[in-house]
UniProtKB/Swiss-Prot annotation:
Annotated Gene Ontology cellular component terms: proteasome complex
Region (Disordered), start-end ranges: 1-28, 561-581
Biological-process GO terms, alphabetical: modification-dependent protein catabolic process; proteasomal protein catabolic process
Source species of the chain: Sanguibacter keddieii (strain ATCC 51767 / DSM 10542 / NCFB 3025 / ST-74)
Assembly mode: Homohexamer. Assembles into a hexameric ring structure that caps the 20S proteasome core. Strongly interacts with the prokaryotic ubiquitin-like protein Pup through a hydrophobic interface; the interacting region of ARC lies in its N-terminal coiled-coil domain. There is one Pup binding site per ARC hexamer ring. Upon ATP-binding, the C-terminus of ARC interacts with the alpha-rings of the proteasome core, possibly by binding to the intersubunit pockets.
Chain segments carrying region Docks into pockets in the proteasome alpha-ring: 580-581
Keyword Nucleotide-binding applies: yes
Protein name per the record: Proteasome-associated ATPase
InterPro entries in UniProt: AAA+_ATPase (IPR003593), AAA_ATPase_domain (IPR050168), ATPase_AAA_core (IPR003959), ATPase_AAA_CS (IPR003960), NA-bd_OB-fold (IPR012340), P-loop_NTPase (IPR027417), Prot_ATP_ID_OB_2nd (IPR032501), Prot_ATP_ID_OB_N (IPR041626)
Length: 581
């Protein structure tokens, strides 16, 4: 084959294998342009994200490379943009960033310093610290405080305490490095021992104690409502009142009613002064202030005052009277109520206890009539054993007024029953039918019936036979041990019986039989309670005073309460009465 033949064949082959190139249309160009634009947008977005990530990483690198900042405590500002601060125990004179408002800084406030020791930000006040007690307030925003181990030091008052009514004895938090006190801490030990709320009990809630209520109103409210007359006659109001008598007869209720009545008297007095545009104790009274007028009732939990550490009980008594003086200085009457007073203030030197009262009693005496006057404060003590209270407390000038709270007589029992057995209670239909539907008449009849049963001098009501030291014997009835608390319990028993009968029979309402049965059941529960081991102590607490009792015989009733068993139950008196309470 010649070269010309090969050339011809090659040319034919190339010409045969090469197709014709198609011509581009405008639609194809537009489509390719759209694809390229989308790719360009995605690329720009990725580049933007990468740029932002780079900037973020650069900022983190700069943050990591920064030197650590420090905190300091602001002391004073000099007016030229420079400050005195305390940092790490060192007093420093530094500058401040223009972004910091120096007029808002207060002494003791935290500030932030940069690496050049320039104040760049303001913070708050230190929320933690050691506890110290204020001993004396000094000039220029300083105070003398007592810390651990009775260590005394002078500290500065932080701006957070500006205007706070501080006084000696307040507990404060202190930052020992800067020497600032920041916050007043409530005294939990006093809060646990007293109750400042004014009770919602008034004299109308107390039955059977009309003469005693009149006595205590004359002693407490008369001097408060008419102070000018007392000053005119040179008469001082009583400093204290002793309520004594058997348990459950209303001593605590009377004390609460006194506080409530004083609060109402304060409100009336302030309201009258506000309407007249006058003053109370030299200060103008607004209507809003008059509406907030009240009194304080410090209910001291007596046994909780006792402490195993020497001097702690006396310190608690001082704190309580300090609290009372603080409230009284604001023009509010304060009632300090000691319940079970004999547990704290026994006769000194009797040897019936650990003799802690040798220092507790003098502390109370110094608080009541010591060098510091006790104005607008009335001390009320309640006790079942007034014979065990130290005579120095009971003398005139301390507990001036002594009111005996007797057990209720039949008329008093009717008044007490009427407080708990009211016409709004459901009454059984049969009892209503007997009185032509008159609910008030039904209730009066119920009360009359149960009081007659309770106070009857019958054999079924015999409770105890006591033998005195002289050999005389006396039979005591359940009425001799009746109390307001027992009457309330009888009514509650009757209500519960009425509920049980309704659930069993479907008949709703209280019946007179419920009350009589409740009275008998209450007697049954109490017949095992007399302390025949120490009969004289038990009788004194129960209100039976006079000749010493050496023997008690309980008279056991039949189960149905219809009569007395043939043999009474006796327990021999111990030869040594031992320690009581």
């Amino acid at each position: 084959m010649t070269s010309s033949d090969l050339t011809q064949r090659k040319g034919l082959t190339m010409s045969d294998s090469t197709p014709d190139t198609p011509r581009s249309t405008p639609e194809d160009a537009a489509r390719r342009l759209a694809v390229l634009s989308a790719q360009n947008e995605r690329l720009a977005q990725v580049l933007g994200e990468a740029r932002g990530k780079i900037v973020e990483l650069q900022q983190q690198i700069e943050e990591f490379a920064k030197p650590p900042g420090t905190f300091a405590v602001f002391l004073a500002e000099h007016g030229d943009g420079t400050l005195d601060v305390m940092s790490a125990g060192r007093k420093m004179h530094v500058g401040a960033s223009p972004s910091v408002d120096l007029t808002q800084l207060r002494p003791g406030q935290e500030v932030s310093l940069n690496e050049a020791f320039v104040v760049v930000a303001a913070g708050g006040f230190e929320p933690v610290g050691e506890i110290v007690t204020v001993k004396e307030l000094l000039d220029d925003g300083r105070a003398l405080v007592v810390g651990r181990s009775d260590e005394e030091r002078v500290v500065r008052l932080a701006g957070s305490l500006a205007g706070a009514p501080l006084r000696a004895g307040d507990a404060l938090t202190v930052d020992t490095r800067s020497g600032f006190v920041y916050e007043r801490i409530p005294k939990a030990e006093v809060e646990d021992l007293v109750l400042e709320e004014v009770p919602d009990i008034d004299y109308g809630d107390i039955g059977g104690l009309g003469p005693q209520i009149e006595q205590i109103r004359d002693a407490v409210e008369l001097p408060f409502n008419h102070p000018d007359l007392f000053r005119e006659h040179g008469l001082r109001p009583p400093k204290g009142i002793l309520l004594y008598g058997p348990p459950g007869c209303g001593k605590t209720l009377i004390a609460k009613a006194v506080a409530n009545s004083l609060a109402a008297a304060v409100a009336r007095r302030a309201a009258a002064a506000a309407e007249a545009g006058g003053t109370v104790d030299g200060s103008p009274v607004l209507v809003e202030t008059a509406n907030q007028a009240k009194s304080y009732f410090l209910n001291v939990k007596g046994p909780e005052l006792l402490n195993k550490y020497v001097g702690e009980t006396e310190r608690h008594i001082r704190l309580i009277f300090s609290r009372a003086r603080e409230k009284a200085s604001q023009g509010y009457p304060v009632v300090v109520f000691f319940d079970e007073m004999e547990s704290l203030f026994r006769t000194r030197g009797t040897g019936l206890s650990s003799d802690v009262e040798t220092t507790i009693v003098p502390q109370l005496l110094s608080e009541i009539d010591g060098v510091e006057r006790l104005d607008n404060v009335i001390v009320i003590g309640a006790s079942n054993r007034e014979d065990m209270i130290d005579p120095a407390i009971l003398r005139p000038g301390r507990l001036d007024v002594k009111i005996k709270i007797e057990r209720p007589d039949p008329e008093g029992a009717r008044e007490i029953f009427a407080k708990y057995l009211t016409t709004d209670l459901p009454i059984h239909a049969d009892d209503l039918a007997e009185h032509q539907g008159d609910t008030a008449a039904v209730v009066d009849g119920m009360i009359q019936r149960v009081v007659e049963r309770m106070y009857a001098d019958t054999e079924e009501n015999q409770f105890l036979e006591v033998t005195y030291a002289s050999g005389d014997k006396e039979t005591l009835y359940f009425k001799d041990f009746n109390s307001g608390a027992m009457i309330q319990n009888i009514v509650d028993r009757a209500k519960k019986s009425a509920i049980k009968d309704f659930l069993a029979t479907g008949q709703r309402g209280i019946r007179v039989e419920h009350l009589v049965t409740a009275c008998v059941d209450e007697f049954k529960e109490n017949e095992d309670l007399p302390n025949t081991t120490n009969p004289d102590d038990w009788a004194r607490i129960s209100g039976k005073k006079g000749e010493r009792i050496v023997f008690i015989r309980t008279i056991v009733q039949d189960k149905n309460g219809s009569g007395r068993s043939a043999a009474g139950r006796t327990i021999e008196t111990a030869t040594s009465t031992g320690q009581y309470l």
